[in-house]
């Protein structure tokens, strides 16, 4: 563990939906869903907190969301707007440190260990950042402050929306002991069920197992959870982390024009992409569909979720949404492809049922 490290995790609250409510006062206080049309096999990219009260969450089929809340307002994502707002937020963060690691459009780690701002207080810096984001961008953010990345991330999730949580070396052990195992960074349904089966429900339950035992049960994840349970995370905030993507495309033997036939091919492609993600211990937030026509022109359509995914079923829900907005103009298709980008750090990668940064 590094001495005197001061790490802040900034996490924008319901980012896409909050931007839409900011820009359109008629949406404020209403259940708003950013994503696909419920009548066209779309998926939810994100939703407002008003919509979440109905059990709606990211990657849920839009039709399911509609059934849960028929009065919800559905709108298409405006990715260029979200990217512009993200740059505004990141510019603010960069004023406080030159060690900023964006994880996606709406969250980032900031290492303020050597910062002289706010008399060197990470807590005061986090509060000032939150205040500036609200005044200058018109949005709320949640902040976590701690001495490593794992605890800073857990802290930002603790009091959403518009909250701040500080985890010190003195209170970290108590915080981790009480933390439900499903809240641990990277622990999804599969690992959660495995741990529940051996009597692990909270952080304190992990302390009863040796590193060797956890590795035997969970593989490499076991070593990481062993360290997390003891408040250990030596990863550095990395402003130069390279963004990569994982994808697969197929050139068809014969040009096709039937949508159902395309869906069948995309099902196979998504299986391959999901397999690659699993093999590389990766998952991502952005799903991109590529379509090349028989005149060799091509188009891409993308959707960025507010949680990470790697499972084939979730990927295909997004792909079906994307293909529904492609204008084929009566042209035949000669190539189809799927790419997953905005990849998560290679720590513990597994599907999460809920949003990875919106609680």
UniProtKB/Swiss-Prot annotation:
Its cofactor is Mg(2+). It catalyses: DNA(n) + a 2'-deoxyribonucleoside 5'-triphosphate = DNA(n+1) + diphosphate. InterPro entries: DNA/RNA_pol_sf, DNA_pol_Y-fam_lit_finger_sf, DNA_pol_Y-fam_little_finger, DNA_polymerase-Y, DNApol_IV, Rev_trsase/Diguanyl_cyclase, UmuC. The record marks 16 as: Substrate discrimination. It is found in: Cytoplasm. GO terms for biological process: DNA-templated DNA replication; error-prone translesion synthesis; SOS response. Binds 2 magnesium ions per subunit. Its main location: cytoplasm. The keyword Lipid metabolism does not apply. Mg(2+) binds at residues 11, 106. Keywords: Cytoplasm, DNA damage, DNA repair, DNA replication, DNA-binding, DNA-directed DNA polymerase, Magnesium, Metal-binding, Mutator protein, Nucleotidyltransferase, Transferase. GO terms for molecular function: damaged DNA binding; DNA-directed DNA polymerase activity; magnesium ion binding. GO terms for cellular component: cytosol. The keyword Signal does not apply. Its EC number is 2.7.7.7. Residues 7-188 form the UmuC domain. The active site is at residue 107. Pfam families: IMS, IMS_C. NCBIfam families: PRK02406.1, PRK14133.1. Belongs to the DNA polymerase type-Y family. PANTHER family: DNA POLYMERASE KAPPA, DNA REPAIR POLYMERASE UMUC / TRANSFERASE FAMILY MEMBER. Monomer. Poorly processive, error-prone DNA polymerase involved in untargeted mutagenesis. Copies undamaged DNA at stalled replication forks, which arise in vivo from mismatched or misaligned primer ends. These misaligned primers can be extended by PolIV. Exhibits no 3'-5' exonuclease (proofreading) activity. May be involved in translesional synthesis, in conjunction with the beta clamp from PolIII. This is DNA polymerase IV. The lineage of its organism: Bacteria, Bacillati, Bacillota, Clostridia, Eubacteriales.
């Amino acid at each position: 563990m590094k001495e005197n490290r001061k790490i802040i995790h900034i996490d924008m609250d319901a980012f896409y939906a909050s931007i839409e409510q900011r820009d359109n006062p008629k949406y404020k206080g209403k259940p708003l869903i950013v994503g696909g049309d419920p009548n066209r096999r779309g998926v939810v990219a994100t939703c407002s907190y008003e919509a979440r009260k109905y059990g709606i969450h990211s990657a849920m089929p839009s039709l399911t969301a509609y059934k849960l809340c028929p009065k919800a307002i559905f709108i298409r994502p405006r990715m260029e707007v979200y990217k512009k707002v993200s740059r505004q937020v990141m510019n603010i963060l960069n004023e406080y440190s030159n060690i900023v690691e964006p994880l996606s459009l709406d969250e980032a780690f900031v290492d303020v260990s050597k910062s002289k701002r706010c008399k060197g207080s990470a807590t005061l810096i986090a509060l000032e950042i939150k205040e500036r984001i609200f005044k200058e961008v018109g949005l709320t953010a949640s902040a976590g402050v701690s001495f490593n990345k794992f605890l800073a991330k857990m802290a930002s999730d603790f009091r959403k929306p518009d909250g701040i949580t500080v985890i010190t070396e003195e209170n970290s052990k108590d915080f981790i002991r009480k933390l439900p195992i499903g809240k641990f960074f990277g622990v999804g349904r599969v690992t959660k069920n495995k741990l529940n089966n051996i009597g692990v429900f909270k952080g304190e339950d992990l302390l009863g197992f040796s590193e060797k035992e956890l590795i035997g049960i969970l593989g490499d994840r076991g070593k990481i959870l062993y360290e997390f349970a003891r408040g250990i995370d030596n990863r550095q905030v990395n402003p130069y982390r390279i963004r990569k993507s994982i994808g697969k495309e197929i050139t068809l033997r014969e040009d096709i024009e039937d949508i159902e036939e395309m869906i069948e091919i995309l099902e196979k492609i998504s299986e391959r992409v999901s397999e690659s993600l699993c093999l590389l211990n990766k998952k991502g937030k952005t799903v991109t569909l590529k379509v090349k026509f028989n005149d060799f022109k091509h188009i891409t359509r993308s959707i960025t979720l507010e949680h990470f995914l790697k499972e084939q079923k979730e990927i295909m829900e997004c792909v079906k949404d994307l293909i529904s907005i492609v204008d084929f103009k009566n042209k035949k298709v000669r190539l189809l492809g799927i790419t997953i980008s905005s990849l998560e750090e290679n720590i513990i990668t597994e599907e999460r049922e809920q949003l990875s940064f919106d609680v």
